[in-house]
Amino acid sequence: PVPLLYHKQVRCQNNFCAVRFLYRAANSAILKFIREWKENAGNFRPAEDESMDKIIIRPMTPEDWGAVSRIYVEGIATEYATFQTECPPYTAWDASHTKECRLVILSGGVLAGWCALHRVDPRWCYRGVAEVSIYVGEQFRGHGLGFQLLSALCAAAEKAGYWTLQSTVLQDNAASRALHAKCGFRLVGHRERIARDCHGHWLDTYLMERR
Protein backbone atom coordinates (compact mmCIF):
# COMPACT_ATOMS: atom_id res chain seq x y z
CA PRO A 1 0.00 0.00 0.00
CA VAL A 2 1.05 3.63 -0.70
CA PRO A 3 2.01 5.48 2.48
CA LEU A 4 -0.52 8.02 3.71
CA LEU A 5 2.20 10.66 3.83
CA TYR A 6 2.72 10.26 0.08
CA HIS A 7 -0.96 11.04 -0.61
CA LYS A 8 -0.70 14.17 1.50
CA GLN A 9 2.42 15.29 -0.36
CA VAL A 10 0.75 14.78 -3.75
CA ARG A 11 -2.36 16.66 -2.59
CA CYS A 12 -0.25 19.57 -1.34
CA GLN A 13 1.70 19.70 -4.59
CA ASN A 14 -1.54 19.78 -6.61
CA ASN A 15 -2.97 22.53 -4.42
CA PHE A 16 0.24 24.54 -4.75
CA CYS A 17 0.18 24.21 -8.53
CA ALA A 18 -3.44 25.35 -8.64
CA VAL A 19 -2.72 28.37 -6.43
CA ARG A 20 0.36 29.26 -8.46
CA PHE A 21 -1.68 29.05 -11.70
CA LEU A 22 -4.41 31.30 -10.29
CA TYR A 23 -1.81 33.77 -9.01
CA ARG A 24 -0.10 33.98 -12.37
CA ALA A 25 -3.42 34.40 -14.20
CA ALA A 26 -4.55 37.15 -11.82
CA ASN A 27 -1.16 38.86 -11.97
CA SER A 28 -1.21 38.75 -15.78
CA ALA A 29 -4.71 40.27 -15.88
CA ILE A 30 -3.69 43.04 -13.48
CA LEU A 31 -0.56 43.86 -15.48
CA LYS A 32 -2.60 43.92 -18.72
CA PHE A 33 -5.14 46.30 -17.15
CA ILE A 34 -2.39 48.64 -15.92
CA ARG A 35 -0.71 48.61 -19.34
CA GLU A 36 -3.97 49.41 -21.17
CA TRP A 37 -4.87 52.08 -18.63
CA LYS A 38 -1.54 53.82 -19.20
CA GLU A 39 -1.95 53.64 -22.98
CA ASN A 40 -5.47 55.09 -22.88
CA ALA A 41 -5.18 57.43 -19.92
CA GLY A 42 -5.65 60.45 -22.17
CA ASN A 43 -9.01 59.13 -23.35
CA PHE A 44 -10.55 58.90 -19.90
CA ARG A 45 -12.57 61.81 -18.50
CA PRO A 46 -14.60 62.22 -15.35
CA ALA A 47 -18.27 61.36 -15.88
CA GLU A 48 -19.40 64.89 -15.14
CA ASP A 49 -17.36 66.22 -18.11
CA GLU A 50 -19.63 64.37 -20.56
CA SER A 51 -22.25 67.10 -20.20
CA MET A 52 -19.77 69.69 -21.49
CA ASP A 53 -20.00 68.18 -24.98
CA LYS A 54 -23.79 68.00 -25.04
CA ILE A 55 -25.30 69.94 -27.95
CA ILE A 56 -28.83 71.34 -27.71
CA ILE A 57 -30.70 73.30 -30.38
CA ARG A 58 -33.85 75.07 -29.21
CA PRO A 59 -36.03 78.10 -30.02
CA MET A 60 -34.58 81.47 -29.11
CA THR A 61 -36.23 83.40 -26.27
CA PRO A 62 -36.00 87.11 -25.36
CA GLU A 63 -33.92 86.06 -22.35
CA ASP A 64 -31.22 84.84 -24.76
CA TRP A 65 -30.64 88.32 -26.15
CA GLY A 66 -27.64 89.06 -23.93
CA ALA A 67 -25.69 86.10 -25.32
CA VAL A 68 -27.15 86.52 -28.82
CA SER A 69 -26.11 90.17 -29.03
CA ARG A 70 -22.64 89.35 -27.70
CA ILE A 71 -22.14 86.77 -30.46
CA TYR A 72 -23.54 89.25 -32.99
CA VAL A 73 -20.93 91.81 -31.91
CA GLU A 74 -18.19 89.18 -32.36
CA GLY A 75 -19.44 88.61 -35.90
CA ILE A 76 -19.47 92.33 -36.65
CA ALA A 77 -15.89 92.59 -35.38
CA THR A 78 -14.65 90.20 -38.09
CA GLU A 79 -15.70 92.75 -40.76
CA TYR A 80 -16.53 89.91 -43.17
CA ALA A 81 -19.70 88.46 -41.63
CA THR A 82 -21.99 91.45 -42.13
CA PHE A 83 -22.11 95.06 -43.29
CA GLN A 84 -23.58 95.98 -39.90
CA THR A 85 -21.28 98.16 -37.82
CA GLU A 86 -23.14 97.86 -34.53
CA CYS A 87 -25.63 95.54 -32.87
CA PRO A 88 -29.19 96.93 -32.89
CA PRO A 89 -31.34 96.98 -29.75
CA TYR A 90 -33.54 93.95 -29.23
CA THR A 91 -36.73 95.76 -30.21
CA ALA A 92 -35.31 96.68 -33.63
CA TRP A 93 -33.86 93.22 -34.19
CA ASP A 94 -37.11 91.56 -33.12
CA ALA A 95 -39.15 93.70 -35.51
CA SER A 96 -36.93 92.88 -38.50
CA HIS A 97 -36.88 89.09 -38.10
CA THR A 98 -39.63 86.52 -38.41
CA LYS A 99 -41.11 85.24 -35.16
CA GLU A 100 -40.68 81.63 -36.23
CA CYS A 101 -37.39 79.89 -37.02
CA ARG A 102 -35.32 81.66 -34.39
CA LEU A 103 -32.92 79.08 -33.02
CA VAL A 104 -29.97 78.95 -30.65
CA ILE A 105 -27.40 76.21 -30.18
CA LEU A 106 -25.95 75.39 -26.77
CA SER A 107 -22.69 73.54 -26.18
CA GLY A 108 -22.20 72.27 -22.66
CA GLY A 109 -24.98 74.56 -21.46
CA VAL A 110 -23.41 77.69 -23.02
CA LEU A 111 -25.17 79.55 -25.84
CA ALA A 112 -22.72 79.09 -28.71
CA GLY A 113 -24.60 80.44 -31.74
CA TRP A 114 -27.90 81.58 -33.17
CA CYS A 115 -29.80 81.88 -36.42
CA ALA A 116 -32.94 83.60 -37.65
CA LEU A 117 -34.82 84.64 -40.80
CA HIS A 118 -36.08 87.91 -42.19
CA ARG A 119 -38.34 88.36 -45.17
CA VAL A 120 -36.80 89.69 -48.36
CA ASP A 121 -40.03 91.26 -49.63
CA PRO A 122 -43.29 92.10 -47.84
CA ARG A 123 -45.44 91.24 -50.85
CA TRP A 124 -47.67 88.17 -50.52
CA CYS A 125 -46.13 86.41 -53.53
CA TYR A 126 -42.76 86.28 -51.73
CA ARG A 127 -44.15 85.04 -48.42
CA GLY A 128 -42.12 81.82 -48.69
CA VAL A 129 -38.77 83.51 -49.30
CA ALA A 130 -36.47 84.54 -46.46
CA GLU A 131 -32.89 85.64 -45.82
CA VAL A 132 -30.72 83.71 -43.38
CA SER A 133 -28.78 85.20 -40.49
CA ILE A 134 -26.43 82.81 -38.69
CA TYR A 135 -23.64 83.49 -36.21
CA VAL A 136 -21.43 81.23 -34.09
CA GLY A 137 -19.48 82.52 -31.09
CA GLU A 138 -15.77 83.05 -31.61
CA GLN A 139 -14.66 80.34 -29.19
CA PHE A 140 -17.01 77.77 -30.74
CA ARG A 141 -16.09 78.18 -34.39
CA GLY A 142 -14.59 75.31 -36.32
CA HIS A 143 -16.36 72.54 -34.41
CA GLY A 144 -19.30 71.85 -36.72
CA LEU A 145 -21.87 73.82 -34.72
CA GLY A 146 -22.67 76.07 -37.66
CA PHE A 147 -23.58 73.05 -39.79
CA GLN A 148 -25.85 71.64 -37.09
CA LEU A 149 -27.51 75.00 -36.56
CA LEU A 150 -28.05 75.80 -40.24
CA SER A 151 -29.34 72.28 -40.90
CA ALA A 152 -31.87 72.71 -38.09
CA LEU A 153 -32.89 76.10 -39.48
CA CYS A 154 -33.47 74.65 -42.96
CA ALA A 155 -35.67 71.91 -41.49
CA ALA A 156 -37.63 74.40 -39.37
CA ALA A 157 -38.10 76.77 -42.32
CA GLU A 158 -39.41 74.00 -44.55
CA LYS A 159 -41.85 72.95 -41.83
CA ALA A 160 -42.98 76.57 -41.47
CA GLY A 161 -43.80 76.79 -45.19
CA TYR A 162 -40.78 78.61 -46.62
CA TRP A 163 -39.86 77.41 -50.08
CA THR A 164 -36.68 79.42 -50.63
CA LEU A 165 -33.91 80.45 -48.26
CA GLN A 166 -31.22 82.81 -49.43
CA SER A 167 -28.03 84.15 -47.91
CA THR A 168 -25.88 87.09 -48.93
CA VAL A 169 -22.24 86.25 -48.20
CA LEU A 170 -19.43 88.80 -48.29
CA GLN A 171 -16.52 88.11 -50.64
CA ASP A 172 -13.98 87.30 -47.91
CA ASN A 173 -16.22 84.90 -46.00
CA ALA A 174 -15.16 81.64 -47.63
CA ALA A 175 -16.10 79.63 -44.53
CA SER A 176 -19.70 80.84 -44.77
CA ARG A 177 -19.91 79.95 -48.47
CA ALA A 178 -18.61 76.46 -47.69
CA LEU A 179 -21.08 76.06 -44.83
CA HIS A 180 -24.06 77.07 -46.94
CA ALA A 181 -22.96 74.80 -49.79
CA LYS A 182 -22.69 71.91 -47.34
CA CYS A 183 -26.30 72.56 -46.28
CA GLY A 184 -27.63 72.49 -49.84
CA PHE A 185 -27.32 76.15 -50.87
CA ARG A 186 -26.07 76.89 -54.37
CA LEU A 187 -24.46 79.99 -55.79
CA VAL A 188 -26.98 81.92 -57.90
CA GLY A 189 -25.34 85.32 -58.14
CA HIS A 190 -22.15 87.34 -57.79
CA ARG A 191 -22.63 91.06 -57.29
CA GLU A 192 -19.47 93.07 -57.92
CA ARG A 193 -18.64 96.22 -55.95
CA ILE A 194 -22.18 96.25 -54.58
CA ALA A 195 -21.45 97.92 -51.25
CA ARG A 196 -18.78 99.71 -49.25
CA ASP A 197 -17.53 98.59 -45.88
CA CYS A 198 -16.89 100.85 -42.90
CA HIS A 199 -13.45 101.71 -44.31
CA GLY A 200 -14.86 102.79 -47.65
CA HIS A 201 -13.67 99.72 -49.57
CA TRP A 202 -15.84 98.32 -52.32
CA LEU A 203 -16.89 94.73 -51.70
CA ASP A 204 -18.50 91.97 -53.73
CA THR A 205 -21.21 89.70 -52.39
CA TYR A 206 -22.35 86.21 -53.32
CA LEU A 207 -26.01 85.26 -53.33
CA MET A 208 -26.63 81.66 -52.28
CA GLU A 209 -30.00 79.97 -52.39
CA ARG A 210 -31.63 76.81 -51.13
CA ARG A 211 -34.95 75.54 -52.51
Please annotate each region the language model reported.
Residues 85-139, 150-151, 211:
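Acetyl-CoA-dependent GNAT
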Residues 157-169:
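Conserved GNAT acetyl-CoA-binding A-motif
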Residues 142-155, 178-182:
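Conserved acetyl-CoA-binding loop-helix of GNAT-fold acetyltransferases
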Residues 110-113, 175, 202:
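Glycine-rich acetyl-CoA-binding "A-motif" of GNAT/NAT acetyltransferases
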Residues 141, 167-177:
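Conserved beta-strand-loop-alpha-helix junction that forms the acyl-donor binding cleft
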